[in-house]
Amino acid sequence: FLMCVSFSFSCKEGVKEVRVLKLAHGLPPSHSVHLGLLYMNERLKELSGGKMSMDIYSSAQLGSENQCIELLQIGSLDITKVSSAALEGFADPFKVFGIPYLFRSREQFFEVLDGSVGKQILGSTEPYWFRGLAYFDSGARSFYTVNKQIRTPEDLKGLKIRVQKSPIAVEMMKTFGGSATPVDWGELYTALQSNVVD
């Protein structure tokens, strides 16, 4: 996951008004990322002396990840939290995060993200009028199914697996023998109920 910010918001020196930034994401209010964003808002208020705050829109209220990126580009949104898959269509460097088993350990993963390579990737969207601010760790890749345990890649053969809308994710699933089915996070529950995905 990444935090991205629009180039369109500005802070005028000497202005005493509270600057309210609009932030949107697709996760429910109970999700740990949303709780982290609430904490971030409290810190923003504290560190700005009450001159800045955020209105946080969860559960894809303002649209899908791609729609939030588009809102960012036109200045209708100040900050969004999206997956790297949503950014692949804007900047090729984000495709690296879809490659399975790329990093040897969590330590190496964070070493890369916190270093010069991670900073270059965050900045790679600048030609598209937004910039990455920070990375969120969403944990290891996991597969969950309605009625079958997945212990090895071979267990994915023949299953309809929900993937993000990412060419890398689709190709990975094909390599594992599963049927890749791109579904937005907000539509996943319905897709499972209607057997669109397993």
Predicted ranges, named:
Residues S30-D55, P167-E171:
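Short, polar/charged alpha-helical segment
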